[in-house]
Curated annotation (Swiss-Prot):
SUPFAM superfamilies: (Trans)glycosidases. The lineage of its organism: Bacteria, Pseudomonadati, Pseudomonadota, Betaproteobacteria, Rhodocyclales. Belongs to the glycosyl hydrolase 3 family. NagZ subfamily. This is Beta-hexosaminidase. InterPro entries: Beta_hexosaminidase_bac, Glyco_hydro_3_AS, Glyco_hydro_3_N, Glyco_hydro_3_N_sf, Glycoside_hydrolase_SF, NagZ_Beta-hexosaminidase. It comes from the Bacteria.
Length: 356
């Protein structure tokens, strides 16, 4: 397939690869890499944040590279997975805090989740970030070393209710969301960043419990879904993110999900069973992922961009384009003038104090 490399450098459709960058500003090498037709987005990390002004400059620089602008994303869940924590950003509690509040007061928990979603999204948008990879929809079985307090609750209906409130708050601010890690990472003990997790359960248990939040009406509000680098050997021999059964038959077919499917980071240990970086990208794409993430290994990113020539379906490009956010505040100073934001921030601040 022709990747339209003959187009002017600043005008080209969004591609299926999301990369990271090293520091507070782009290097010349990174600018060139982000102009590659295969690239469609950038994921930021804590190392990319010094202060509010610097982050705004970085996102503006990334957005100015191309038209349509590259999508800028971040893992900004709250709790221990919150990349930006100071100077323009409110500390968001872990999702387990909201689950514990649910045990005491359902109404307060739902309102707190909505406020957390609004604050999280509004602050990111005010700094030029388009998308957060949240909420975590994994169930808190108490055994996963990587999920833990990132999960709302053990009960899938509680997870769905709290996540829907969080997602509604994000939508009110103008941001879509990405549920993860389909079909569920909570039962697998190993951390897929450094190991290859295995979940030995049968399909019916996973469908009834872990997939329930995706089958809930919440699933229709998700802009994206990220599958787990977990193997469910009694269902399919491939990790979920490389499995047509999980992504096409179940997520697209039985669940009816129509948004973007993002791979988890292809450099994680849980992805290595598939082969080298090209094999991983091909497998994820072939299974049904629209966007593949390659993080923390610029050498592998360069290798993939040099060797991969995917056939990108128009409907996949359309799904990616639909992720475009609609920020309501131009910058953090303007955000402070919004009474809805200030009220929501007060609720979130009080929740952190109550559960610290």
């Amino acid at each position: 397939m022709t990747l339209q490399s003959d187009l002017p450098a600043t005008v080209r459709p969004l591609g299926p690869v999301m990369l990271d960058v090293a520091g507070f500003a782009l290097t010349e090498e990174e600018r060139e890499r982000l102009l590659d037709p295969l690239v469609g987005g950038v994921i930021l990390f804590a190392r990319n944040f010094r202060d509010s002004e610097q982050l705004q400059a970085l996102t503006a620089e990334i957005h100015a590279l191309r038209s349509p602008a590259l999508i800028i994303a971040v893992d900004h869940e709250g709790g221990r997975v919150q990349r930006f924590r100071t100077d323009g950003f409110t500390r968001i509690p872990s999702m387990r805090c909201l689950g514990r509040l649910w045990e005491r007061d359902h109404v307060a928990a739902l309102e707190s989740a909505r406020c957390a979603g609004y604050v999280l999204a509004a602050e990111l948008l005010a700094h030029g970030v388009d998308l957060s990879f949240t909420p975590v929809l994994d169930l808190d079985y108490g055994c996963s070393r990587v999920v833990g307090d990132r999960a709302f609750h053990r009960d899938p209906l509680v997870v769905a209710a709290l996540a829907q409130s969080l997602v509604s708050g994000m939508a009110d601010a103008g941001m879509g969301c990405v549920g993860k890690h389909f079909p569920g990472h909570g039962y697998a003990e190993a951390d897929s960043h450094v190991e290859i997790p295995v979940d030995e359960r049968e399909f019916d248990a996973i469908w009834t419990e872990d997939i329930a939040p995706y089958r809930h009406r919440l699933g229709r509000q998700l802009a994206g879904v990220m599958p787990a680098h977990v193997i469910y050997p009694r269902v399919d021999p491939n990790p979920a993110g490389f499995s047509r059964f999980w992504l096409q038959d179940i997520l697209r077919g039985r669940v009816g999900f129509g948004g973007v499917i993002f791979s988890d980071d292809l450099t994680m240990e849980g992805a290595t069973v598939v082969g080298d970086i090209l094999a991983r990208a091909r497998a994820a794409f072939g299974a049904g992922c629209d966007v593949v993430l390659v993080c923390n290994r610029p050498d592998l990113a360069v290798d993939l961009l040099d060797r991969w020539a995917p056939d990108i379906a128009p409907e996949s490009r359309a799904r990616i384009e639909a992720l475009r956010s609609r920020p309501q505040a131009a910058d953090p100073f303007a955000l402070e003038l919004h009474p809805v934001y200030r009220q929501a921030r007060d609720v979130v601040a009080g929740l952190v104090e109550d559960t610290a």
